[in-house]
């Protein structure tokens, strides 16, 4: 039996891997992938680079995508945003999302969805230096989009995000006191959402998570 050249074998294996790997982020980060089983999802997204419990991290077209598996099926999808990695949220919630092809901001999503985001944060006061905390806008969709939820996130590293968080924090400290803010009571109280909404309006989102029963920071 004639042996195949090593270069040919390598080409066949590379071709098989290419077929298994998604060609675009759009093939992985879309509403049709929610609810699919893990085996099918990985046939499109490829093999995860890292796994932590139910969370599996993939690299597609240079973009970081995290899929959370619940009982073997995809329950949430998270995309880290960069100038090269942009989310088309219309593939999840239709016209409730801003049109693709433009930077995603909290204000753009508020306008497209008709509002109703609740605002949360990992920490706003006494956070320390062990990590960079994020601020979040959480949206719960109507029946028309099967109650889909969207979680917008902005890490507090860019000046705009830091300044917006400062405005939000300072107003709450002025009204409720610093202990109230340090205890993150704002995560369970919607009184200051209008302040956060105005402050974060033009802040660009750094990651977006879509699914149902999303986890948000508590108090």
Residue ranges and their predicted role:
Residues 15-17:
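N-terminal signal peptide c-region/cleavage motif recognized by signal peptidases
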Residues 44, 50, 80-219:
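Non-cytosolic coordination micro-motifs
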Residues 23-98:
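Short N-terminal edge-element motif at the start of the domain
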Residues 1-9:
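Bacterial N-terminal signal peptides that target proteins for export
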Residues 9-11, 30:
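Generic anion/oxyanion-binding catalytic loop in active/binding sites
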């Amino acid at each position: 039996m004639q042996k195949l050249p090593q270069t040919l074998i390598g080409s066949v294996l590379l071709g098989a891997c290419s077929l298994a790997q998604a060609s675009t982020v759009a093939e992985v980060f879309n509403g049709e992938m929610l609810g699919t089983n893990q085996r099918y999802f990985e046939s499109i997204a490829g093999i995860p680079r890292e796994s932590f419990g139910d969370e599996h991290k993939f690299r597609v077209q240079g973009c970081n995508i995290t899929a959370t598996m619940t009982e073997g099926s995809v329950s949430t999808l998270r995309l880290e945003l960069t100038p090269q990695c942009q989310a088309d949220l219309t593939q999840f919630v239709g016209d409730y999302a801003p049109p693709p092809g433009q930077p995603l901001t909290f204000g753009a999503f508020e306008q497209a969805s008709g509002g109703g985001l609740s605002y949360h944060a990992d920490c706003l006061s006494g956070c320390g230096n062990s990590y960079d905390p994020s601020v979040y806008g959480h949206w719960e969709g109507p029946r028309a989009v099967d109650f889909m939820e969207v979680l917008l996130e902005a890490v507090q590293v860019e000046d705009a995000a830091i300044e917006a968080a400062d405005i939000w924090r300072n107003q709450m400290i002025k009204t409720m006191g610093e202990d109230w803010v340090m205890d993150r009571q704002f995560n369970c109280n919607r009184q200051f959402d209008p302040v956060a909404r105005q402050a974060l309006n033009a802040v660009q989102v750094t990651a977006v998570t879509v699914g149902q029963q999303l986890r948000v920071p508590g108090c």
